[in-house]
Every structure is written in C-alpha cells, then in structure tokens.
Amino acid sequence: MTIRYPNGKRYNQASQPHKTPIKKHTYSNRGMSLEEELNETNEYYLTHNIACVHKKPTPLQIVKVDYPARSAAVVKEAYFKQPSTTDYNGVYKGKYIDFEAKETKNKTSFPLQNFHLHQIEHMKQVIAHNGIAFVIIKFTLFDELYLLDAKHIITFWNRQNTGGRKSITKEEIVEHGSLLSCGYHPRIDYIRVLDTVYFS
C-alpha cells in the first residue's frame, strides 16, 4: 500500500536491518512490540477502572482500493490527512494525559530525529493547558523502559536547535526520567510512576 503525506511525498517506513541481535524474552513480553504492550496495559487500566487511555488513530485519506473478492477490500494507496501528534491520550484522576511511545536499539542515547516538530509543539500545548505530557522510551537491547516528562524532551529539542547534541544520552534519561516496571498485569505499569511524579 502506498501512503503519502499531504504534500504528495511518499511515506517510506524505516527499513529494519536484516540481522537483529538475539534478545532474551520474558514470559510477560515475548514477541510483543512496545505499542502492543501499551495497548494491553491501557486495556487493563480501562477494565479495572483505573484510567481511560486510548491509542490515537492515524488520520488517513484513502485514495485507491482494490476489491479482489466481494467480501475483501485491499487499500492500495492512501495519504496522511494531517501530521499526527502523539500516540496516546486519555484521562487519569481527572487530568488529561498525552504521551508518545518510542523504541531505540541504541545502547547509549536516544536520537531526537525520532521526534517531529509538530509533536514537540503539541506537547508544549498540552503543558500550556495544564495537561500531563510525557514520553515512554524503550531501550530494546536492555529491555528497559523510562517515562520522561515532556518538559525535558522540549529542553533537549531546544538544545539541539542551538547547536547542541542531536540525541539524549541514556544517562540524561536515567537522571531525569523514571524507570518503568514490567509485569504480567499490567504489562507496563506507567500509572504507578504518574502517581509518584505528578500526583504526590
């Protein structure tokens, strides 16, 4: 399927390297992506009346559809209607929460090129309206997850724009962020960290 941006440029998904390092999987996360783990976590929170958080749909304009059978439709070409903001939003303890989920195979840093300007602007707007904005970053080689408040992401973004580093070091993420615990239910208990960081 061909997907295009509003300006007509083709969207090319980053290709995955052919050789990937062998990763130890625990029984709690075998074969799951960060997005799948968060979706399952949010389902748990919703079912247990803890929080109401959902994945935002990507706004697409479908251009070409093939119908190989009467009961099946295959989308062949689509455009992004508008730039997406962040991955998830919802409500917890009466506060609006909004966050992005990112993974990296880097060992020592997280590249800021994984963010787009419109995402940074969106997080600024959430903060300006007294909402809670943050990023969940997964270092896949270590199977470590951190919750980092958006104000730090914005600071590092501004540093890059004034000639500084184009990445956030893992040490900076450890210093300013919070390590997330992983388990069975919920898989990624980010609400526990929200309680500590924003509600204590």
Swiss-Prot record:
Keywords: Cytoplasm, DNA damage, DNA recombination, DNA repair, Endonuclease, Hydrolase, Magnesium, Metal-binding, Nuclease
Superkingdom classification of source: Bacteria
Enzyme class (EC, first level): hydrolase
GO cellular component: cytoplasm
EC number: 3.1.21.10
Gene3D superfamilies: 3.40.1350.10
Role this protein plays: Endonuclease that resolves Holliday junction intermediates in genetic recombination. Cleaves mobile four-strand junctions by introducing symmetrical nicks in paired strands. Promotes annealing of linear ssDNA with homologous dsDNA. Required for DNA repair, homologous recombination and chromosome segregation.
Residue sites binding Mg(2+) per the record: T85, D87, E100, Q119
Family stated for the protein in its record: Belongs to the RecU family.
GO biological process, one term: chromosome segregation
HAMAP family: RecU
Gene from which the chain derives: recU
Protein name in the entry: Holliday junction resolvase RecU
